Amino acid sequence: MTNAAKHLTNGGRELIAFRVGDQEFCVNIMAVREIRGWTPATPMPHAPAYVLGVINLRGAVLPIVDFSARLGMKAAEPTVRHVIIVAQVKSRVVGLLVDAVSDILTVSDRDIQPTPDIASDFERSFARGVLAIEGRMICLVELDSVFPSEEREAA
């Protein structure tokens, strides 16, 4: 058994880390279906400001969400350097525009620190904790909380 496999059977989990601006975030790897390069999206009328539009993903219409804008940060200006994380959010599949994918992490539950009390209610609603790894601070995000039910329908 590999060290990673042993770690996972001992309460560990695998996460995908990615950059948005100067910050790093991570999500459960099981929510990620694929990572692909930036594809220009077709804008949709009346969509929330953080929804860039839709793309055709092998015959399926995939909404593309500017993850930075969704978190209340400065909206991204997509370039060929950006990537789309195709992720499952409850019963929907969405594309998350991020700057770059940085790592696949294997962590134990004790590596995850609680979200600081200084975080806003919005941040606490989606942030499940903070990881301090190799001098980096990485926010663990719960995607189901980033997209409440009524907003998932809009996306």
UniProtKB/Swiss-Prot annotation:
GO biological process: chemotaxis; signal transduction
Domain CheW-like: residue ranges: 12-152
Subcellular location: Cytoplasm
CDD domains assigned to the protein according to its UniProt record, in alphabetical order: CheW
Protein keywords: Chemotaxis, Cytoplasm
InterPro entries the record matches: CheW, CheW-like_dom_sf, CheW-lke_dom
Gene Ontology cellular-component annotations: cytosol
Alphabetized SMART domains for the sequence: CheW
Function: Involved in the transmission of sensory signals from the chemoreceptors to the flagellar motors.
PANTHER family cross-referenced by the UniProt entry: CHEMOTAXIS PROTEIN CHEW (PTHR22617:SF23), CHEMOTAXIS SENSOR HISTIDINE KINASE-RELATED (PTHR22617)
Protein name: Chemotaxis protein CheW
Source organism per UniProt: Rhizobium meliloti (strain 1021)
Gene name as annotated: cheW
